[in-house]
Amino acid sequence: TTILLTNQILSNMFKHLNALFIGLALFACTSGAVAQTIKPIETPVPVRPAGQKDVVGLTAPKLDVVRVGFIGLGMRGPGAVERFTHIPGTQIVALCDLIPERVAGAQKILTKASLPEAASYSGSEDAWKKLCERNDIDLVYIATDWKHHAQMAIYAMEHGKHVAIEVPSAMTMDEIWALINTSEKTRKHCMQLENCVYDFFELTTLNMAQQGVFGEVLHTEGAYIHNLEDFWPYYWNNWRMDYNQNHRGDVYATHGMGPACQLLDIHRGDKMNYLVSMDTKAVNGPA
């Protein structure tokens, strides 16, 4: 009874506070007391092609052994290869990176785990396509620089592969819809590897919420702060630092938002109607 009463009180409180904040914001905008610019960004859903079904509940035929090919063995890739050496029912078939030494380094991970050497692809910016074209791979794991994520995933799905993509899976809305359309057409899984959603702590919290430990969830908060100073040398051609120097803000908001969305059943019975993004004055970053 206490929990239900508390939730009702909180619910009413948030409703009144929300109305108050909206009223204050409107007053500030119309009174001239505060100079601010509101720029709504529309993200319309394109017309879905006739006969094309969504993949929210997609199931694929069972695989006794999942054969995996990895593209990108710089910062994130080697750790992924190492993790797969511990997963029963998987086979690491192929490894690809532009730099041959990184492929060789990943091969050593397999050797250490007493696993056979995988096929190697390197030395060319198109070498990854040959990996995707193999007929003995079920899943392509993509851990390259961000701008190549979508095109690699689309190519892999078009060649009959499921794909798993490091965050972010795409850089533009056009790329996002291209991933969705390709997944729907090919009926292949296209999964964003959002580690801050699937880590132990987040999944434990989600399970507790789903079991009713917290009562009705009315408010969530999420954030992500990560000092990458120790890792800059591992990024090919300095791409990660270049991106940070040319952009500010949260460059992959799903780390903070993803777990919160899961707690609120977003896209599983509920949805976001709008998203508010606030900026601050640049100090050391780009203006």
Regions found by a protein language model. Give the residues of each.
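Bacterial N-terminal signal peptides that target proteins for export
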Residues: 5-21
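Boundary at the C-terminal end of the N-terminal hydrophobic targeting segment
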Residues: 33-35
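Short, Asp-centered acidic motifs that coordinate Mg2+ and/or phosphate
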Residues: 94, 139, 219
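A structured beta-alpha segment of the ubiquitous adenosine-cofactor-binding alpha/beta core
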Residues: 118-142
